[in-house]
Amino acid sequence: MSIERITYDNFQNDPFINELDINDETKGAYEILKWAYQTYENDIVYSCSFGAESMVLIDLISQIKPDAQIVFLDTDLHFQETYDLIDRVKDKYPQLRIKMKKPELTLEEQGEKYNPALWKNDPNQCCYIRKIKPLEDVLSGAVAWISGLRRAQSPTRAHTNFINKDERFKSIKVCPLIYWTEEEVWSYIRDKDLPYNELHDQNYPSIGCIPCTSPVFDSNDSRAGRWSNSSKTECGLHVTDKP
């Protein structure tokens, strides 16, 4: 693909949305990733949650740029199973450069400054401190970043394009998996025998921080179980409103 380098300042629309064959094996994901790494080279970062979609993207990225930079927002509140998965990914893809990005405040410092249970009393502020601000720091030196958003995940993600102007981070957000279904994600994982978070086998469709993630037994919503006792549906990385 010969599309020019798209930046936050020159973005007009997604040039790929009606151009790629979404009926191919990866529904356009491989082609988008190939273009992204050829275009942005080292100016693009994959912000990885190590969820199911992440396993698909990591495998595709490793075929295109084996030493790609991947950032995990380590809030210090993740499940041990998530950290175990990261170790397995490092073993399987040893060339990948996986960076564990921590917040400026430790949990103890956050508790002293705000509230010992900030994730419960003000989850938006907690997400800002432990996820959004760290990603702001990471993206300050990048032109674009990759995300595993899928349109079918939730109403707030239903209009996501391959290439998006990201107002939150003043960046370009590349979303290769927008047309994938949850079933296709898991078929890819199983067909390729990829590692994945063991909590998925324990009724956790979506996995984040321990205090804000619950198992789900009666919903087909892939985002169910996140902030289940509140109206909150996003950590804030993919919305423009600030706390």
Curated annotation (Swiss-Prot):
Pfam families: PAPS_reduct. Pathway: Sulfur metabolism; hydrogen sulfide biosynthesis; sulfite from sulfate. Its cofactor is [4Fe-4S] cluster. Gene3D superfamilies: HUPs. InterPro entries: APS_reductase (IPR011798), PAPS/APS_Rdtase (IPR004511), PAPS_reduct_dom (IPR002500), Rossmann-like_a/b/a_fold (IPR014729). NCBIfam families: APS_reductase (TIGR02055), cysH (TIGR00434), PRK02090.1 (NF002537). This is Adenosine 5'-phosphosulfate reductase. It comes from Staphylococcus epidermidis (strain ATCC 35984 / DSM 28319 / BCRC 17069 / CCUG 31568 / BM 3577 / RP62A). The lineage of its organism: Bacteria, Bacillati, Bacillota, Bacilli, Bacillales.
